[in-house]
């Protein structure tokens, strides 16, 4: 799967928690430059240099784009608003109190709890995760660590009837 320039910018913005204008402001890029790059699927040398100067060489590397995509997929597919609601109700908190503490509107928090909307960025998710002291993901999304079984073979020598024979001992360990 290849990434378009629009995908690269959108995934990067999602990961960093920035909108297009904030990226332009921080890099010194004109908003029309970014719009052109997204619309025409062309990343000019100047645009790339401005992004590299501010965000580093790897801002659009394949590894980072895949990581950004994984994070976005976690938010889109595995986020559980009902869990947020349960945690809030367990603490006897109101939506308005939690919204004020998180710095968002109570209607947005309510729509997140009902599953209508999700997080705008990965950084916002991390903020909520820290506030709720829970990962806020569906139970089916949590991967349990697979037990790895390592098989070790040892060569042994046995004295059988006055002469030595070679044998093997197999030992399995859970790591």
Predicted regions and their residues:
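Residues within the helices of the helix-turn-helix
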Residues: 10, 21, 49, 85, ...
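The alpha-helix within a helix-turn-helix
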Residues: 13, 24, 52, 88, ...
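Short alpha-helical DNA-recognition segment
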Residues: 17-36, 92-111
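Short amphipathic recognition helices of helix-turn-helix/homeodomain-type DNA-binding modules
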Residues: 61-76, 138-156
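Interfacial/linker helices and their anchor residues that mediate assembly or domain coupling
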Residues: 86-93, 141, 147-175
């Amino acid at each position: 799967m290849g990434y378009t320039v629009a995908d690269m910018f959108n995934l990067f913005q999602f990961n960093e928690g920035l909108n297009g204008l904030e990226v332009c402001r921080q890099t010194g890029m004109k908003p029309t430059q970014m719009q052109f790059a997204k619309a025409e699927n062309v990343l000019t040398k100047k645009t790339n240099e401005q992004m590299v100067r501010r965000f580093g060489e790897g801002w659009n590397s394949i590894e980072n784009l895949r990581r950004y995509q994984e994070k976005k997929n976690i938010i889109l597919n595995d986020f559980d608003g009902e869990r947020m609601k349960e945690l809030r109700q367990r603490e006897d908190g109101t939506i308005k109190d939690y919204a004020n503490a998180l710095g968002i509107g109570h209607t947005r928090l309510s729509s997140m709890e009902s599953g209508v909307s999700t997080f705008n960025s990965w950084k916002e998710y991390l903020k909520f995760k820290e506030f709720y002291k829970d990962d806020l993901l569906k139970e089916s999304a949590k991967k349990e660590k697979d037990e790895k079984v390592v098989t070790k073979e040892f060569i042994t020598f046995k004295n059988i009837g006055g002469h030595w024979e070679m044998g093997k001992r197999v030992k399995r360990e859970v790591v």
